[in-house]
Amino acid sequence: MQLHGGFTFDDAAAWMPYLHALGVTHLFCSPILQASPGSTHGYDVVDHSRISEECGGEEAFQRLSQAAHEQGIGVVVDVVPNHMAVPTPIWHNHALWDVLRRGPESAYAEWFDLDMTDSQAILMPVLGNRIGRELEHISFTTDVINGEEQPVVAYYDQVFPVRPGTEDLPLDELLERQWYRLAYWRIGSEELNYRRFFDVDTLAAIRVEDPAIFEATHRTLIKLHAEGLIDGFRIDHIDGLANPRQYLADLQRATGGCWVVAEKILEYDEVLPADFECAGTTGYDSLLRVAGLFHVPGSVPRLTDLWERMSGSGEGFASTVLNAKRTVVKESLFTELNRLVNIAMAICDGDIRLRDHTRRQLNHAIRELLYQFSRYRAYVEPGRATPESEREIIVEAATKAREYLTIDELDALDLVVALALGETGEADMGGAVTLPAPSKILNQLPGRAHNPSDLRAEFMVRFAQTCGPVMAKSKEDT
């Protein structure tokens, strides 16, 4: 059930007798945590400690759960571990507000997947034009934020915090001294320095691979499960996580073995890794096969002809998807590509054996490898041997990518493949690099890794996280 302010927990509870009469065994609820004001879907969470007030709050959810259980209906809740909302105004997301206000001194400084290389300010691409043309619309004022009067920077309906100690500066200097940077919305696709859900700037990724962040963001849902109000969880966009396998293991330990399914799009011959501690996927793979029953095989030529005439393209589907991937990576996901290139360049700069790969060569090699992935991602982890099945996915993509590269770019591709697999690179393509434990690597603020092992681990994780959005925004959307 899609829950929101127009269809609350109590509204849903009234339907339980009817659903029971239909033979329904379980109720699947959209995310129930506090979302952005006016949210119609709940995937834009702003507060993990509260149940949606617009849907009625925790007491109303208790009534819904009770009504469902009285009819013998279990309750499954959608969990959004990958991201939080960047709402308008931002103070609705207290964690993000505090990071923008206090920077590295914030208690939430490590929550968000930030690229703080070279001490960049966090980009906030909200301005309608270049900042020089918008200064007259930006003002310093005060506002009551969560019951506390605070100095703020205001821009129309947007409100931003002010770094303590900068309140008395002239506006232009004050803006320069903040932990964030107000910018023209059009530059977000090129310069954004926080990971996000696909290409959506208003959904900022969080780092549930950190045990403390996992606990803080899941505490409320785990409590409701322990109280018997929730019977199972559906995990949204599991491929966005740094370590999906570890996340599922953490959730099982925290809940004592709860029933869990993961939103995972499996390609036709793909199977879920055997060590994923869940009951299976949400069923997209089953739906693919069931939908096939409603298609007459002999009609494929007619449907293909219709598609070609409507699209104006004589290309087959595979070529169309490949072209879509090229567009997506060069445009919508440029900032993600740029981050990978920056990490690869830093690795090369720090290891004399790997130098003399140019930025252009690495850029092209990374792009082509992303284009040729046949699945949403390979499940690789720093410090853990890569299963042969996952290695084959990357090697297969690399084999296809080689057809599009020059000789110099082929050398760069070999390095990129080695990094994606967690190997040492050109100096030793066959052996695995000795990496710190995943908890040590992933508990550091991304972008602040300095030693070679940490940079390699970061590339390994970031590359895997980028593959999914490329597939989703090309093949899935196409």
Sequence positions of predicted segments:
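Acidic/aromatic-lined carbohydrate-recognition and catalytic surfaces
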Residues: M1-E191, R195, E227, H237-L303
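Short aromatic/hydrophobic contact patches that present stacked aromatics
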Residues: Q2, A205, G232
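A generic short-segment signal for beta-strand/edge and adjacent turn/coil regions
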Residues: D44, D201-L203, I230-D231
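Flexible, glycine-rich loop/tail regions that form catalytic "lids" or insertion modules at the edges
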Residues: E167-H225, L241-A249, C258-T478
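A conserved hydrophobic secondary-structure block that centers on an alpha-helix together
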Residues: K223-F233
